Design a protein with these regions (language model features):
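Interfacial transmembrane-helix boundary/kink motif in multi-pass membrane proteins
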Residues: 2-17, 37-42, 60-77, 109-142
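Alpha-helical transmembrane segments in multi-pass membrane proteins
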Residues: 31-109
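Alpha-helical transmembrane segments of multipass membrane proteins
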Residues: 19-27, 47-51, 77-78, 95, ...
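Juxtamembrane helix-loop-helix connectors linking adjacent transmembrane helices
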Residues: 30-38, 110-181, 263-264
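Residue-level signature of transmembrane alpha-helical entry/exit and packing/kink sites
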Residues: 11-12, 40, 67-68, 92, ...
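Transmembrane helix-loop-helix hairpins at the membrane interface
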Residues: 19-29, 45, 163-264
Length: 264
C-alpha cells in the first residue's frame, strides 16, 4: 500500500496545531487558577472552552486526527509538569503548525498551495542550503559578533543572561534549539509573517519572542538576525536558505557557550 506523504504531513501538522493550542489554553487556565475568585472564573471558562474545542475536534474530524490530538495533549501536560523547559517545545510546535492551519482553514488553501505561499520548495535545495550555511558562517555571524562588541562598548552587557540559561538547560533542549526550533521559527516569522507585515515588523516580533531571556542584547541580536534572514528570504524566495542559516547560527552559538563553560 502506497503512503501519501503529503497527506501524512498535513494531518501531523493539524494534530500538532490542535494539541499545542489546547495545551496553551489549559496552561493559561491553570495559571489563572491561583488568582482567587477572578482566577477561578477564568480557569473554569478556559477549561470549559478547551474541553468544548476538544469535543468539537473529536466530532468533526476523523479518529486519525482526534485521537492523536487527545493523546498528545495529555503527553504535553504531563511533560510540562515534569520539566519547566517543555513549554518551549510546545511553543515551537505551535509556531510550526500555525501557518499551515491558518492557510487551510482561513485562506482555504490546499497543502501544496500552502507550501508554495510559505516558499517551501525542493527546487535548488542544495544550493540554498549551502548559501544559508556559508552566509551565516562568513557574514551573519561576524556581523552579530561585531554587534555584541558595540553593545558592550555602550554598556549593554546582559548577553550573559542567555548563556547562563542555556548552560542550565538540559542537553535535549540545546539539541532542539538547533534542529526543530529554527524550522518552526522560520516558517512562522519569515515564511508566514514577513509577506504579511513586512521585514521590519516581523524582525521586531522575532526579537520580542526572544526577550523571554530578559536581555536587551538578545532582543537586539534577534532583531538584527531577523532582518538578515528576512533579506535572505526575499532574495532567494526559498525557505530552505533561512532555515539552514538559522540552524547554523544556533549551532555555532550553542557550541561557543558549551565550549566556554568547559574550558573557561
Amino acid at each position: 500500500m502506497r503512503i501519501d506523504l503529503q497527506k501524512v504531513a498535513e494531518k501531523l501538522l493539524l494534530v500538532l496545531f490542535l494539541s499545542s493550542s489546547l495545551f496553551f489554553v489549559l496552561e493559561i487556565a491553570l495559571r489563572a487558577y491561583s488568582y482567587e475568585l477572578a482566577g477561578m472564573i477564568i480557569f473554569t471558562a478556559m477549561f470549559c472552552a478547551g474541553m468544548v474545542a476538544l469535543a468539537f475536534v473529536s466530532a468533526k474530524l476523523e479518529k486519525t486526527v482526534s485521537i492523536p490530538v487527545a493523546a498528545l495533549l495529555i503527553f504535553f501536560l504531563y511533560a510540562a509538569s515534569v520539566s519547566m523547559f517543555f513549554n518551549s517545545i510546545v511553543l515551537s510546535l505551535f509556531l510550526l503548525s500555525f501557518p499551515f492551519a491558518w492557510l487551510r482553514f482561513v485562506e482555504k488553501k490546499t497543502f501544496n498551495e500552502s507550501l508554495q505561499l510559505l516558499m517551501a520548495t525542493r527546487k535548488g535545495f542544495l544550493w540554498n542550503a549551502l548559501l544559508g550555511f556559508c552566509l551565516t558562517l562568513f557574514l551573519f555571524y561576524p556581523i552579530m559578533f561585531l554587534e555584541v562588541v558595540i553593545l558592550k562598548l555602550v554598556g549593554i552587557t546582559d548577553v550573559s543572561n542567555v548563556s547562563e540559561i542555556i548552560r542550565k538547560a538540559p542537553l535535549w533542549l540545546a539539541v532542539f534549539s538547533f534542529t526543530v526550533a529554527p524550522v518552526a521559527e522560520e516558517f512562522f516569522f519569515r515564511g508566514f509573517l514577513l509577506p504579511r507585515i513586512g521585514i521590519v515588523a516581523s524582525a521586531v516580533l522575532f526579537g520580542l519572542a526572544h526577550y523571554a531571556y530578559s536581555s536587551v542584547a538578545e532582543f537586539l541580536g534577534a532583531f538584527t538576525i531577523g532582518l538578515l534572514l528576512g533579506i535572505l528570504l526575499l532574495r532567494t524566495r526559498n525557505i530552505v536558505s533561512v532555515i539552514v542559516a538559522h540552524i547554523t547560527f544556533n549551532l555555532i552559538s550553542i557550541l561557543i557557550i558549551y565550549l566556554g563553560s568547559w574550558f573557561g
